[in-house]
UniProtKB/Swiss-Prot annotation:
The keyword Magnesium does not apply. It is found in: Cytoplasm. Phosphorylated on threonine. It catalyses: ATP + H2O + a folded polypeptide = ADP + phosphate + an unfolded polypeptide. GO terms for molecular function: ATP binding; isomerase activity. One of its GO terms (cellular component) is cytoplasm. Its EC number is 5.6.1.7. Its main location: cytoplasm. Belongs to the chaperonin (HSP60) family. The gene is groEL. It comes from the Bacteria. Keywords: ATP-binding, Chaperone, Cytoplasm, Isomerase, Nucleotide-binding, Stress response. This is Chaperonin GroEL.
Amino acid sequence: PAKQVAFAEHAREKMLRGVNVLA
């Protein structure tokens, strides 16, 4: 489902942002 894909994209972006903050 497109909604699930959008959620995965958002989660990945959020995780990457967190990694950037920790880096």
